[in-house]
Amino acid sequence: MLAYHNDPTQKDAILAKLSAHRLADELVKGHYWENGKGCAVGCTIESGNHAEYEHRFGIPRILARLEDRIFEGPPNGSAKEWPEQFMGAIRPGADLSMVWPRFALWLLTEELPQFVKKKTTKAALSEVGALYREWCETAKNPEAHRWMKARKNASAAAAAAAAAAARGKAYQRFAAKLVELLEAA
């Protein structure tokens, strides 16, 4: 699959369309496409079907999902420029098949670890990161059973982290209630 099916006019057309949506203030967060307005994906394809990116633009759907998620995150001003930045960064004819694994590797090994405190969570990030590293180095997606094992371990780490966070919040509620009752006594 080649980006824009190796046709620069496809890129020019979508950039013009996205610019028109931005200038008309039709880029909005929270829904795909409704009444002539939508999110990054919605204004690009006038639907929420990320798979259309593959057929219409030669862009893997996982990148459309990532574009979508990133659009919803920042403040409105920079978010409205994001669809043009995203589509504008893609060279017609580019093979984008390794962009997702490279992004995921960066995210798991460079960006997220700085926010992780628990050893089990760090181990889960490392395990999944190792699979993405292998994918990036060999250009071959590791076998499904290896992803499933990593997913299971990551899910267990996430559940443990969520339980710990919930316990922490519960103790905060316990403390608040106790203070309330002490003050009322």
Regions found by a protein language model. Name each.
Residues 1-156, 167-185:
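Short, glycine-biased loop/turn motifs at secondary-structure junctions and
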